[in-house]
Amino acid sequence: MLDSGMINKIQKAREYASEPERIHFRSLEVEFDGKNGEHHVDFREGHWHCDCDYFRGHHTCSHTMAMERVLGIMAPAEVA
């Protein structure tokens, strides 16, 4: 049985979820199971980072692009 406090929290969660512009990523860190092994992908200080060889030379890779697709509209935007 839900009490009134929990009902209010659920309603507040729905409100937040309907206004994604109120949510701001400061950091995000994941372990990505790639075809050639695991890769560490993170978003910090306004930029994506990956430990794969391709990212080192191009500042983007399939792992960071996949994270942007998975997160959809919630993907953090890189700063200039």
List each model region and its residues.
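Long, low-complexity, compositionally biased intrinsically disordered regions
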Residues: 1-80
